[in-house]
């Protein structure tokens, strides 16, 4: 054995099915996977971005240009690609919008990093340079950002409209922006330190098909898209005691399989009487609690429905968990999971009315501390209202972030071009090879205005030249108007973005790129993916598994 080792033969420590790729091959594999994800969504960026049609394994169709929705619905079968998807999810959770921007920048950072790697610049130097650039970019964002008053409704509407532009909600963006800003203002409170806190837990979004999006409205309280369980139940209460129930009002089933042998009609009647008595006891417990209205998350037996109707109690079954949670907020009720422990103290107070035409219940809490509101979105089809809801949810998150953060930026690629210019100036003060990484970072940021122009059918090079010239003249707000093709003041054009979303996009993209660059060795117990093959564009080098559902994806989507 020692003789073989002296002859330079390697020691085999992994199983025969294991695969390993090292150094440049590993970096090339990871960068290719990350860029494939970025390519998949970059055509959706901006007001002129295209939509994607996603068909899942069940045949359900989703049509959207929302970055995080696209990446979540895609069948991604690659560990590196999944890391980039996490960038979009983090951006969505932290800022509510800017997911496509974050992923696109991450992909461009890695593309530029690959060029540096080919120049024999060590990944550690690139990572240090990217960290310096990211930190400097966030400092400059804060310096460039303009402060916004939470009472400035017009500016907040522009933020909402910018978020919705290019989505299905764009056709009615003025109406929807007004509803969104009013909703956010109703759930905003001022903290002791003067900051503003927006509680989006008190904002619910409900959808209804069959009508136009222009008929969407903002309602105080909750909207429950359910019917009463019995036609004889009252549906109107000015002041009602509300019970939220997470227990079925049905005959209790045993935990084990049992068989009952019935030998006579009397035995059958006793059995039925026992079930009826059990249901009657549950109904009596509800009646004794003083509840006028019951929203039950589970089922209600037909006989129990009859008893509740006789007592003049309104009951709704199979209420969504999210609706129960929202009703808890606006009525002050506690959710009861065991009728045996019910007390009057767990009941909430609310007014309840029925919209027979829309088949909806409107529930409005009673009291000074009630702030819950519902955005009722309407559209012609399920596909329309689903995409409308995604657009409104993003805009809602962005407006809430703007109110809490208090800073806005010019959109249309203005902030990216300005940051790139300032980073290039900053690079002159950076020593070593990190300077090249800072410059590469600046180039990556300019991807945003380039893609905005490409997606609008404009010449990206001419557009970038015009933007750079405007910013060199000191026009910090100069951005691309994709509708006219002109470079103009983005604020005057109403293209306004929240600073927090842009900061988060820069931070998330940088961290993801650095995480990928830091990997120099991939060791897999078997194939890295279950699909794809090495001949695909997305295939891995060195015999590694392919990209699965990602192979060649950038061109297919």
Curated annotation (Swiss-Prot):
Nuclease is among the record's keywords: no
Induction profile: By heat shock (at protein level).
Keyword Chaperone: yes
Bias kind Gly residues: ranges: 539-557
GO-annotated molecular function: ATP binding; ATP hydrolysis activity; ATP-dependent protein folding chaperone; unfolded protein binding
Keywords: ATP-binding, Chaperone, Nucleotide-binding, Stress response
Pfam families in the cross-refs: Cpn60_TCP1
InterPro entries noted in UniProt: Chaperone_TCP-1, Chaperonin_TCP-1_CS, Cpn60/GroEL/TCP-1, GroEL-like_apical_dom_sf, GROEL-like_equatorial_sf, TCP-1-like_intermed_sf, TCP-1_chaperonin, thermosome_alpha
Region feature (Disordered): 527-557
Family: Belongs to the TCP-1 chaperonin family.
Function: Molecular chaperone that assists in the folding or refolding of nascent or denatured proteins along with ATP hydrolysis. ATPase activity is highest in thermosome assemblies containing CCT1:CCT2, followed by assemblies containing CCT1:CCT2:CCT3. Seems to contribute to thermosome ATPase activity. Not required for growth.
Other remarks in the entry: One of either CCT1 or CCT2 is required for growth.
Subunit structure of this chain's protein: The thermosome or CCT complex is a oligomeric complex of two octameric double-ring structures; the complex is probably a heterooligomer of CCT1, CCT2 and CCT3 with yet unknown stoichiometry.
PANTHER family: CHAPERONIN
Protein name, as recorded: Thermosome subunit 2
Record lineage: Archaea, Methanobacteriati, Methanobacteriota, Stenosarchaea group, Halobacteria
